[in-house]
Design a protein with these regions (language model features):
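Outer-membrane beta-barrel strand-turn architecture
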Residues: 2, 12-16, 28, 76-82, ...
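Extracytoplasmic loops and strand-loop junctions of Gram-negative outer membrane beta-barrel proteins
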Residues: 3-4, 42, 53-61, 99-102, ...
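Gram-negative outer-membrane beta-barrel transporters
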Residues: 25-28, 47, 51-129, 134-143
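Outer-membrane beta-barrel translocator domains and adjoining extracellular loop/strand segments
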Residues: 33-39, 46-47, 93, 97-104, ...
């Protein structure tokens, strides 16, 4: 697979600690592996290697596929001053592909928007103000990945998940949302630096969607979700 990129950007610095950046981009993808010219297999006819997340397809492919993606990004950043830092990145985009059938479709990853916010505060503490207590938070919101409809009747007959590839990636999973928080204490000595931290991933315990499949025992389409809340305690000693 090959790509050609076009990017235009603008940067504004209203003060020494603030920076605002905008960027528009267009990417053209070509030589993407797709099904052979004479294929009648639905998966190969309507799909593209650009959508794969689990490795390569074990089929004969040709590099005739194409795709494109384009979007706008806005980044607002405040560098660390007075113990406070902030960065926000907003992206709106489109991601398309064209398979062997010649139809342009949404790619698996066409969530259409991503919002990242990272903020933190540091306090110098201790007798000589050489130790640092810090609190950080990170928020991520994004459009859900796209998925191919499951043919329920054919899945029942086959006893396993059967997709309707003629409608490849025409449906979208629920939007993704996750908040991570971190508290840390760093003690600086003459010859060593020690840090103890508590990271809480997915603070809201939201079970974000990953994919769907046909569950034979329950005779229904079931949503696969990702990991919920996960606390991680760390200690690091540097010499």
């Amino acid at each position: 697979m090959k790509s050609a990129h076009m990017v235009a950007g603008y940067e504004l610095r209203p003060s020494a600690s603030w920076r605002i950046m905008t960027e528009a981009y267009y990417q053209k993808h070509y030589n993407i592996p797709i099904g052979p010219a004479n294929t009648t297999t639905p998966f190969l006819l309507h799909n593209s290697q650009i959508n794969e997340i689990s490795g390569f397809v074990n089929d004969s492919l040709t590099s005739d596929g194409k795709g494109r993606s384009y979007g706008l990004e806005l980044t607002i950043e405040k560098s660390l001053t007075n113990g406070i830092y902030l960065m926000s990145t907003t992206s709106i985009y489109q991601s398309k592909y064209t398979g062997r059938d010649g139809i342009e479709r949404d790619s698996r990853f066409n969530g259409r928007f991503v919002q990242n916010i990272l903020a933190g505060k540091e306090w110098k503490v201790g007798k000589n103000k050489t130790s640092i207590f810090a609190a950080n938070i990170k928020l991520l919101a994004a459009g859900g990945n796209r998925t191919t409809p499951i043919d329920l009747e054919k899945s029942r007959t086959a006893g396993k998940t059967v997709y309707d590839w003629s409608k490849s990636y025409s449906e979208q999973l629920p939007h993704y949302f996750r908040t991570d928080a971190r508290l840390s204490f760093t003690k600086n000595k003459k010859r060593t630096t020690s840090t103890i931290s508590l990271d809480i991933q997915n603070v809201s315990n939201r079970l974000n969607a990953f994919d769907r499949y046909y569950e034979l025992k329950k005779d229904k389409i079931t949503l696969i979700t990702q990991t919920g809340l996960l606390p991680i305690l760390n200690y690091r000693l540097e010499f």
